[in-house]
Each structure stands twice: as C-alpha cells, then as structure tokens.
Amino acid sequence: LNLLIEKINTDVASEILATTSVLIVDDCSSIDRTTPFPAFKGKCIQVLRLYRNLGHQRAIAIGLSYIAEKLPCDKVVVMDADGEDAPNDINTLFARSAQVPGKIIFAERSKRHESFLFRFFYVVYKSVFKLLTGKAITFGNFSLIPQRRLQNLVRVSEIWNNYPGGVIRSRIPYDGVAIERGKRLAGSSKMNFVSLILHGLSAISVLIDTTAVRILISSIIMSGVVLAVICIILFLKLIGNATPGWASMLSSTLLIVMMQSFLISLFMVFMVLQYRTQQHFIPAIHYRDFVESVETIA
C-alpha cells in the first residue's frame, strides 16, 4: 500500500493530485500495519474500516456509498491496491472522462501479465458471459465515476454482488479506454481458483433474469431439435431400418431429457421473477451496518 501511495505521488498529474483524497477500505484485514503511510502530496488519506471481510466487490460498494454520502467530490476512481491498476493510468481515465463527461469510464485491458492458464480461463469466462447474458464484459474494477453517476450507482443493488456487472445491469452510461494491466507491486494474489470461479459466476448472476430467459429459449430450441430427431427415429422404425428396441429406447430417453431441460429452465425463470418482487439490499442505505470506523491519516 505504501508503494502504491508513492506511485500516486509521482505518477498522477499534479493538477489532479492537488485536489485528490485517498480512501482506503480496510475489509477487516488480518495483517496489522507496522509502518506508517508515506507523506501524501494530495489532500488527505482516510481509512474506512469494516467489521468483517465481505470480499472486494462489497468493499467497493461500501466505499462508494460512504463517499457518496460523506465526501463531496467531482470524480471517484476505483482501483485495487496491488498495483495492477497503475496510478499513471488515472491520467488516461481523466482524459477520457473529459471527452465523454457524464459517463463512467472503465479501463479495458489491452494486455495482461498473468500466466497462460489464467489468461485462457479469462477468455473462457468472457465467452461464457457473452453466451449467457448477450453482453460483452472487457473490464474489471478500475474505473472513474463522475459525481452525478455516483449517486445513481450506489442505489443499484447489484453492485453489492459484482461492481462491473452491476453497472452493465443498471444501464448507467459507461465507456472504456484501452489500458495495459500493470504488474503487482509486492506479494502475490490471494484469490485461488475457486474464488476466481465464484467471482465470474457473481458477474453472471447479476444478469440472472436475462440469463434465465436465454437458457429457456435455448431449451426450447433444443426441444425442437430433439422432436425432429425423434420423428426421424420413428420414421426409420416405420420403414424397418431400425434395430428392434433401439428406436423406442432412444426416443423415450430423448423425450425425458427434453422435458427435464424445459421444466428446469421454466422453473428458473419463475424463480427469477419471484426474486424481483423481494426487497433488495441498497448499498447507499445499508452500508453503515458494516462500517466500524473512519480514520483520517493525513
């Protein structure tokens, strides 16, 4: 974290840095700080401490909600503290925001430095996301939010589960700028394979209503294909080209699979529609329950 603050001091444009405050969300870290923060050339550093670890997506939602209520500002930059979101790219986000004011600006990763295995599964994740939701996701958390959109965003319940997915779901205007992913300043990622899968699924779950309908449509199409295959099998049986017992067994098996697929898909759609009638978690209202304290460092 100290390395990141030092890079912010040196890499962020002076006219931006002079009016910048840093809010660090401490999601109940198990590691105590032993060294003080370095001198910050901006306005101040604040640490928002949470009662428990909720995961980085919910930490982002809480941090944004706190800023929206307590810290008047023109723009908010969301970034990870590991250095992979490079501070010098903040200048790029500000430049793009000046071109398209009123939109959330995301950093679209033009190049990544992770292992081949990670990059392979990341491509798989983007493909599955596109297939299930019909939308493309080419960005992560690194972004710039104008004040006007911040007030909209913290009232979007879906950002509690996944920040980028919540923005897509909310239909708040957003844009992207190609930025190369940086390298970690220190240490290694604590996210394991299971955590990465859960993170990917959480993004898809934000758009579960669209996903459920697309699965139902796919099930109906597959049912049509199965019925066509059954008709072909019955035709072969009628003309005597089918092995005795084979046609009946295959037809009944395909029919059972078709019915199960259709009913499960239909049940999923009804579950989603029922969920939409429930009262949802609104970060702007409920974030206070998780805030332990706020400390101003400098």
Model-predicted regions and their roles:
Residues 1-13:
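Short, well-formed alpha-helical segments that are part of the catalytic scaffolds
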Residues 6-7, 165, 169-298:
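Hydrophobic helical membrane-anchoring modules
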Residues 12-17, 40-44:
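Short helix-capping segments at alpha-helix termini
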Residues 16-29, 49:
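Short beta-strand/loop segment that forms part of the nucleotide-sugar
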Residues 26-35, 83-84:
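A conserved acidic beta->alpha catalytic loop
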Residues 46, 50-52, 56-67, 87-161, ...:
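Acceptor/aglycone-binding surface of glycosyltransferases and processive sugar-polymer synthases
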Residues 72-84:
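Short beta-strand-to-loop acidic/aromatic patch adjacent to the donor-nucleotide binding site
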Residues 78-79, 105-108, 177-179:
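Short glycine/serine/threonine-enriched helix-capping/active-site loop
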